Design a protein with these regions (language model features):
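Bacterial N-terminal signal peptides
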Residues: 12-29
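Pocket-lining segment of extracytoplasmic ligand-binding domains
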Residues: 98, 177-266
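Sec/Tat signal peptide C-region and signal peptidase I cleavage site
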Residues: 29-35
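Periplasmic-binding protein-like
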Residues: 45, 115-125, 202-233, 237, ...
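Secondary-structure end/capping motifs
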Residues: 232-310
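Short, glycine-/small- and polar/acidic-enriched structural segments
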Residues: 36-185, 189-195, 206-217
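Ligand-binding clefts/hinges and TM-proximal coupling segments of bilobed small-molecule sensing domains
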Residues: 148-166, 243-275, 315-318, 327-330
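N-terminal secretory signal peptides that target proteins for export/translocation
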Residues: 1-12
């Protein structure tokens, strides 16, 4: 399975390029009867990291194929993939935080399954920082405003009685490699990095000061889909969710079975696997469902940014009906 990163200049161009690439993939595949019987489904992930790991587990272990699904995994920024969900060009988006935010202001999308109820982020600092209070008046790098990195940073600073709007300067500068480079070069004083990204930062002499995932419950990783697509392709959605729930069951029960997946798909070194796996299990959702209260951060952020949006109850941003069906069929 090739994982393609999509980075064109505009939203429409990005979605168009996804479709063009997928058509090439389809054309290049063998035309035997087994391949023809599989139903293609497009899974958009925002990054090849732990948040999307259950998708890679299901793909690597052949669970999608066993359920009759040909999973096409593409990498698209979470803030632009919502258009693809609404139009049906993308079947699933793994950034459920973005799905919740879109649904919260009336977009016809829903979260169908959740993987984690917290992040794997760390506050990583320059080596001379020994206490978070030393970051008062300093800078912290996140990916973008309204992202999980943003929510985690603010929650961590509030926990230690620092006002993230006044006491520290939060800078949205982009992806993990950009944040690592900014921290190591001294352009920022700290950065929110996930448990894979922090490893090269530590090797460069930086310090993982604290695990920020412990201070905020929020949706991290899962599958969201368009309402219309879910109705039109209910059987394919059901099969996909069954594969995903089977992957969750395996991840919880057998770390040794998924270790090769982390090494091959997420580029996790063998010596780092146990620590990364343990971080994931701190916030793992084996049932695939999340408490509604844990959706508050993205939901309230979206509502605050769109005060004229129509009323949308928090409970309506998720739809676990198909997941609940498939859970009964997995032993």
């Amino acid at each position: 399975m090739q994982i393609r990163k999509i980075a064109p200049a505009s939203v429409c161009a990005r979605i168009a390029l996804v479709l063009a690439l997928l058509s090439l993939i389809f054309a290049a595949e063998p035309t035997n009867l087994a391949a023809q019987s599989l139903k293609p489904m497009v899974f958009a992930v925002s990054a090849t990291d732990v948040s999307a790991s259950p998708i890679f587990v299901a793909e690597h272990l052949g669970l999608f194929k066993e359920e009759g699904i040909d999973a096409k995994i593409v990498v698209i920024r979470s803030d632009i993939v919502m258009k693809g969900l609404v139009t049906g060009d993308v079947d699933f988006a793994s950034s459920v935080s973005s799905v919740v935010k879109a649904a919260a202001i009336g977009a016809p999308v829903r979260t169908l399954i959740n993987f984690f109820n917290g992040s794997f982020f760390y506050l990583v600092t320059k080596p001379d920082v020994s206490n978070i209070s030393q970051l008062k008046g300093k800078t912290v790098a996140i990916s973008r405003y309204g992202s999980a990195t943003d929510f985690d940073a603010r929650a961590a600073f509030r926990h230690f009685n620092l006002d993230p709007g006044k006491d520290v300067q939060i800078l949205a500068i982009g992806g993990g490699p950009t944040r690592i480079a900014a921290l190591v070069s001294g352009r920022v004083d700290s950065a929110i990095l996930n448990n894979i990204e922090k490893i090269p930062a530590e090797k460069a002499g930086m310090k993982s000061l604290l695990f920020t995932g412990q201070y905020l419950r929020q949706p991290v990783g899962g599958l969201g889909a368009g309402v219309q697509r879910t109705a039109e392709k209910r059987e394919e959605i059901r099969r996909s969710l069954r594969a995903m729930y089977r992957a969750l069951t395996i991840m919880k029960a057998d770390r040794n079975r998924i270790k090769p997946v982390f090494e091959k798909r997420l580029d996790v070194r063998a010596e780092n696997f146990d620590a990364i796996y343990d971080d994931a299990m701190r916030v793992f959702l084996p049932s695939g469902e999340i408490d509604l209260a844990d959706l508050a951060a993205p939901y309230e952020d979206a509502r605050s940014q769109a005060p004229t949006a129509p009323p949308v109850p928090l409970a309506s941003v998720v739809d676990y009906s198909i997941l609940q069906e498939v859970r009964k069929t997995v032993r």
